[in-house]
Regions:
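C-terminal and inter-domain tail/linker signature
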Residues: 4-5, 20-218
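Sec-dependent signal peptide hydrophobic core
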Residues: 5-11
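C-terminal motif of bacterial Sec signal peptides marking the signal peptidase cleavage site
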Residues: 15-18
Length: 218
């Protein structure tokens, strides 16, 4: 009888260990690296992603109030075009957004598009850094591709994009720096106009005739 009880206890311990082993191993790994992410930090990171999604929804819907609602009143902005590294304020940012609304339609952010080997658009914290290792999610890096349609010409425009956003204690964007090829957008529009404004003569499409604007039928 004692032997049976002993075996029963061993079985219970084994089952309990099996159920909790993965969690325990995770804790051990965290202790070895010194990186322990709290549930509060995880929740804060997810809230920041939701805030950025509201930001991009404001672009798509051309809703300036929705978009600016996630920006702090004292927000600072470093724009994608080089301006001597001059930091702009929230008024300048609002004016730039309004200009995009006036110039483009269907402004859409495609999360993670353009990355190689990963589709994770959002990153925070720093395990490997020139500074100190930390798990603070307040500074978030975002990667993706913006797509839109030029209102005047209907030209489709795409731009690979990278942004660094710092969130304040209220969960709003307090500092915003972004990088993209602004001049490349103008080039895409001009190329579209050049191709679609060409009027072919009666020889276009005929054998032996080379049309630089319609290489698919040459």
């Amino acid at each position: 009888m004692k032997k049976i009880k002993f075996l029963t206890i061993i079985a219970i311990v084994a089952i309990s260990y099996s159920c909790n082993n993965s969690e325990l191993q995770g804790m051990l790994n965290e202790s070895e690296t010194g990186i322990i992410v709290s549930e509060e930090e995880k929740a804060k990171f997810q809230n920041q992603i939701e805030t950025f999604n509201t930001f991009t929804k404001g672009f798509y819907n051309e809703d300036i109030d929705l978009l600016m609602g996630v920006m702090a009143d004292s927000a600072k902005w470093s724009p994608p075009s080089y301006n001597g590294n001059k930091v702009l304020d929230v008024v300048d940012f609002r004016a730039a957004v309004t200009n995009y609304f006036d110039t483009f339609d269907k402004i859409t952010f495609n999360e993670g598009e353009g990355l190689v080997g990963s589709d994770n658009a959002f990153w925070s914290g720093s395990l490997y850094s020139a500074g100190e290792t930390n798990t603070d999610p307040s500074v978030m890096r975002v990667y993706g591709t913006w797509s839109m349609v030029h209102t005047k010409t209907s030209a489709p425009v795409y731009n690979k994009w990278y942004g660094v956003l710092t969130f304040n204690e209220d969960g709003k964007i307090a500092v915003f720096s972004d990088w993209m090829d602004v001049g490349g957008m103008e080039t895409q529009i001009q190329n579209f106009v050049d191709v679609n404004s060409h009027v072919c003569d009666e020889n276009c499409g005929k054998e032996g005739h080379v049309c630089p604007h319609h290489p698919e039928i040459n």
